[in-house]
């Protein structure tokens, strides 16, 4: 009996592990399905330029504090590939009963469809950025100091216009293309007639995978427009640019052919070039600023040229979602025309972006 009992105990002891090993493993817990974003996703930001300007030559010592830009950027992702932007801006009225007042106006209001072709491509419809100025301002961060060269000389009527455009990167990082059709009057004016402006920019990055040479780009821009029938409004720009954490340089040349006057329809040829350089500690920290513009407003007229020199520097604070710049410059404008008084001004400015 004792033997039978011991044998039974041994059989039970051996059977328990075997039984445990043959138990099926519990089913793995299913991974939760990622939650879909709840559209629309709305982000609100601000871009503002504040300044103090003091005239020091031929302007009777005029000086003033001012707000030269105040954007409220409202960006909405309506669906996975659908976006909308609305940006009101503040401008100073210079005529009428409200002359001198700051008033609100619409700067941008457009819809955008993403990834129409190559990844990173998009199409826009409405009041949005034209191909050149927004691109140049992405390289030269000193829009707070003043307008870019072509806009300052009146060849591009503002950075935004009513129209439709398409943007696409080139394969393997070799550049990008942006082109569209616009009213041609800029965002401050309504369409004057049936004629439109066709604008296109091609930017080539010849060495996308070559270290420091990655920062080199060559860009070309062309605007084919009309004031009216037989009154062209053409502009061509070629620019080389180099971007590095410690140095940004651009050199551009432009030519324009225009017939602005309806009463005296004479074709005017204009040309000029501009150099911009910013040696800096990096995106954050101290930076120097040098810009030289030379522009001839009418090649057929003597003494129609003017030169602008901007020199100074700034200090930049850059965070993941915000940027503050403190900028001080001296701007001198020299006119070849003897009857045109030269200009010189000191500018103290602040750039706020968040």
Which functions belong to the PLM regions below?
Residues 49, 56-60, 79, 85, ...:
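Outer-membrane beta-barrel pore domains
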Residues 20-22, 30, 35, 50, ...:
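Intrinsically disordered, low-complexity regions enriched in polar/acidic and amide residues
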């Amino acid at each position: 009996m004792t033997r039978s009992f011991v044998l039974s105990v041994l059989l039970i002891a051996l059977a328990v592990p075997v039984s445990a090993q043959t138990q099926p493993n519990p089913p793995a817990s299913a991974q939760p399905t990622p939650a879909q974003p709840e559209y629309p996703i709305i982000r609100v930001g601000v871009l503002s330029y504040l300044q103090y300007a003091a005239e020091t030559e031929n302007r009777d010592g005029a000086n003033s504090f001012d707000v030269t830009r105040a954007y409220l950027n409202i960006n909405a992702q309506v669906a996975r590939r659908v976006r909308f932007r609305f940006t009101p801006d503040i401008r100073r009225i210079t005529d009428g009963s409200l002359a001198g007042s700051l008033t609100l106006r619409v700067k941008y209001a457009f819809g955008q469809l993403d990834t129409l072709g190559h990844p990173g491509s998009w199409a826009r419809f409405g009041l949005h950025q034209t191909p050149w100025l927004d691109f140049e301002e992405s390289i030269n961060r000193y829009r707070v100091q003043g307008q870019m060269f072509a806009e300052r000389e009146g060849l591009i009527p503002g950075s935004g216009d009513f129209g439709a455009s398409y943007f696409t990167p080139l394969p393997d990082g070799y550049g990008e293309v942006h082109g569209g059709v616009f009213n041609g009057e800029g965002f401050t004016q309504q369409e004057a007639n049936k004629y439109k402006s066709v604008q296109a920019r091609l930017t080539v990055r010849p060495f996308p995978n070559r270290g420091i040479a990655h920062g080199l780009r060559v860009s070309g821009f062309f605007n084919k427009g009309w004031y009216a029938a037989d009154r062209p409004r053409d502009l061509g720009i070629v620019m080389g640019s180099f971007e590095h954490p410690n140095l940004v340089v651009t050199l551009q040349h432009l030519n324009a052919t225009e017939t602005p006057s309806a009463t005296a329809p004479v074709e005017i040829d204009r040309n000029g070039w501009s150099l911009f350089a910013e040696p800096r500690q990096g995106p954050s920290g101290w930076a120097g600023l040098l810009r030289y513009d030379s522009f001839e407003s009418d090649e057929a007229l003597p003494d129609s040229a003017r030169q602008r020199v901007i020199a100074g520097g700034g200090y930049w604070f850059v965070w993941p979602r915000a940027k503050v710049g403190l900028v001080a410059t001296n701007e001198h404008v020299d006119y070849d025309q003897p009857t045109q008084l030269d200009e010189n001004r000191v500018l103290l400015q602040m750039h706020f972006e968040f």
